[in-house]
């Protein structure tokens, strides 16, 4: 599989016909390389690279959030058609919690923050749905349901953006939601993990209810846990999904809540920990791939 993202701005303000030519050229090259699945980013910050009844057109498409493309074309529909012509799958890639990146100025009146600011928190200069709020999960599942119902996608895809990457010296501001919806948890870390677990389970159920043949997959950060913290972990000493992003990926795989898991292994080929990590994920990682363009800015992916 190959990822085609939008947040580096390579499509921003690009004329429709030129963008179509760029995408077709990428698909042709990827097909020649043997790629059979395209993971196309359609929701980067509670916006849309498709015609959404709930969220604004993305600034990463037109340059201004909420501004429709002049020809009223639909990039997601275009990519579905072009991928299927080539016997490729199209996986619609959404970022669930992130609602505003650092480079975004004014939000569209159609943006969910403009309508329901109580669902959001500010952290590290960005805006996020509060994962601790049941209404946040309900809203995200509504977006998933809309995409799966109206588009002939082969999968819904989420990458490594669960709780945000830690910002040194800043605590994620969820005191209010923890007090209101703590569900008896005494350790906040366990509660945060459960918030993400519930969302993953509910997205899985949403997809199955709409179209049972559509897959739901994730491409989380490449370290589940370091072995010094967990015997199931890898011989690594880096940031951990379980402890830092509150993503218990192993639980999702074991419970069948995701159809595929593609860890993002950003270290170089031949890294001393690579073989050890691979032996730990053979039964869980069913696809591999690469990013057609550069990693997202401020992503922590190095």
Put a short name on every predicted segment.
Residues 171, 177-232, 236-302:
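Glycoside hydrolase catalytic-domain groove-lining segments
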Residues 21-48, 150-155, 251, 257-261:
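Catalytic domains of carbohydrate-active enzymes, especially glycoside hydrolases
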Residues 3-21, 76, 81, 91-92, ...:
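Active-site-adjacent "subsite" loops/lids of carbohydrate-active enzymes
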